[in-house]
Amino acid sequence: MIVAMGELILLRHGETEWSRTGRHTGLTDVPLTPAGEAAAAALAPAIAGRDIRCACASPLQRAARTAALAGLTDVKQDPGLREWDDGGYEGLTTPQIREQRPGWYLWRDGVIPGGPGYPGETAEQVGARADDVLTRVTPLLADGDVVLVSHGHFLRVLTARWLRLGPSEGRMFRLGTGTVCTLGTEHGEPVITSWNVPPC
C-alpha cells in the first residue's frame, strides 16, 4: 500500500530536432527547438496552484530547460532521471536500425554498446534507476505533489514500475513531447490518473 496525499506529476521535455526527426536520443545533450520551448512554457498552467513538495529534473538540457520554462523553481538535478542510454543506436532512426536488424524493437531487443560514454542500457537497468527514483520520491507524496521532468522512454519505464509491472511493459504507454502525466493512488494502490496530456 502507498500512503500518498499528493500525486507524482511527470513532464516530458519539449520537442528537440532529434525527437522531431525520429532519432533515438539517449544521452546526447540536444537543445529544445523553438516549438519545444513554446510547448514547455505552455505546461505551466498544468502545475500552477499545485502543492509541490519537490521538483526534480534530468540534468540533460532539454529536461532542465523544460522545467525552467514550465515555471518550476528550486529544481533538483537528478542523474537518475536521465534518458535510456541508446548505446550504439544513439542518433539513429528506427528504420536505420532495422536495416541492420530487421524487425528490431527497442522494448524487446534492446540496444548494442556504443562508443565511449555510450555503453547502452538494458530495460532492467533502466528499471533499476526508476525504482531508485521512486524509492526516494514516494515518501514525499505524503506531504504533497512531486514533479519529475524527464524523457520519454525513462518515464514510460518509471510508470510501469509505479504500477508494479516489468520495465519492458513501458512499451504500452505512448508518450509525446511536451506532455504531462499524473500518477496517483486509489485505495492505496498505484494508478495512472492522467496520461499524455498536451499543453492547454
Locations of the language-model features?
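Active-site signature of alpha/beta-hydrolase-fold catalytic machinery across serine-
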Residues: L69, V157, R161
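Loop-to-helix element that buttresses phosphate recognition and phosphoryl-transfer chemistry
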Residues: L8-T66, P116-D131
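Short basic (Lys/Arg) and small-residue
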Residues: H151
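Phosphate-coordination/substrate-recognition cap region in phosphate-metabolizing enzymes
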Residues: I2-V3, A42-Y105
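Short hydrophobic/aromatic-enriched beta-strand-loop microsegments
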Residues: P31, T73-G80, G166-R174
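Internal catalytic-core helix/loop-beta-alpha segment
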Residues: W104-R108, I112-L141
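Acidic, low-complexity terminal tails and accessory targeting/binding regions
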Residues: I2-G6, D86-Q96, P139-D145, A160-C200
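Short active-site segment of divalent metal-dependent hydrolases/proteases
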Residues: T16, F154-L155
